Amino acid sequence: MRIGFKLVLVAVMTMLILIPLAMVNGLIGERQRYRDAAVADIGRMYASPQTVFGPVLTVPYTESVDLQETGGDGVVRTVRKRQASAWTFFPTRLDASGTVATATRRRGLYRVPVYEWAGTVKADFDVQIPGDVAGADRVIGTPVLGYGVTDVRGLHGAPKLQIDGREVALLEGAGTQDDAGMHAALPVPAPGAHFALISQLQLKLAGTQSIAFVPLGKQNHIALGSKWPHPSFQGLSPWQSEISDTGFAAQWQVASIATDAQRQYLARLPQNTTTGSGPSAARDVTLPTLGVVLDDPIDAYTLADRATKYGVLFVAITFVGFFMFEVIRQLPIHPIQYGLVGLALVIFFLLLVSLSEHVPFPVAYAAASGGCIGLIGFYLSAVLRSALRGAAFGATLGLLYAALYGLLISEDNALVLGSLLLFAILAAVMIATRRLDWYRLGSQVASTRTA
């Protein structure tokens, strides 16, 4: 079999191995979806990822306005109607702080981080109520100080609200259309009155995976601490953070002009509605948030998916090694033997995924790679007609697996490490074949086959 034809055959075998590799990659995606479903199930049973917004001071009012309406006869008439609306005021300063106590919930094979945030939300308001408008017959309603949370099932115990040092009763709902949360009713102010208050809410809020805050104050200070050692900060980066094996502490200092949260909140509120219906600011809009995700630094499915991206490289390198043995040592290797070794390399990724669901990823990687190296080394001892050659090939394969593990755990340096690995492999092939006369070798192989 001529060298050129054998090279084409090796390339075809490599392409065929891509089929089972793609099947393994699809399996990884399927297992990820199962994991996501488990996370959603725990969120439904426990509490969803939480986003906290507020407090927001809402002062409703009604007034008489002149509206232009077209009658059935096509004539435009001016009609005077009562119209409901509201003024919305944000804190001049908002402080949210507390500790995030974490735990792990299990759903089948999957573990999901959950938490309970024991926190305090302090806010200062200093607003001016608009004065009367001549002829409007304006009537100011009961002001509402509202706090929003994504999932009220996460509220543990009874939250306590103090306004100007006095405890105030909390009611269900955030005080605006369908918003989940809590609110307090305040005394009705006079038109043109100066309205100032200091509020402090103490609560315990449970959730899964992440907690975030909407910076609605003119000045916002958010401080979080936890024993979770692997936080992933979302939104704007904290201006100060400390992360160690024992946990993290982070603080954000953000002005409203840096987030545009106030404008986005107002843009989604119902305006000048007489029915009280309209979009929910808490549910229908994605407001800017600051917070933390309780991340898993070693996501087995993500690492396995990245590993399969290198699968074709592994197969190609192994087949190149086979080819070198075949042409240099004059050892005929059948295409079926190429295929069996290629399938063994694919089985490594399948073992990696399945084992990592039960044991830590490093242990799963060591077990899967060790099993495949042992199997391939044992098989090649017969194929290459030497136990030493089989052991040497297995040792080389072990170095490749070690290099792959380094690529997986060092994502930031994956490109440079991968480039160096490819350079080293190419250099090894060039050095090993630097004195080969490929024309003469091809003729020798052809004559040997003929004889």
PLM segments and residue spans:
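Soluble non-transmembrane domains of integral membrane proteins
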Residues: 37, 44-45, 58, 70-288
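Hydrophobic alpha-helical transmembrane signal-anchor segments
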Residues: 1-26
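Glycine- and acidic
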Residues: 21-25, 297-307, 406, 410
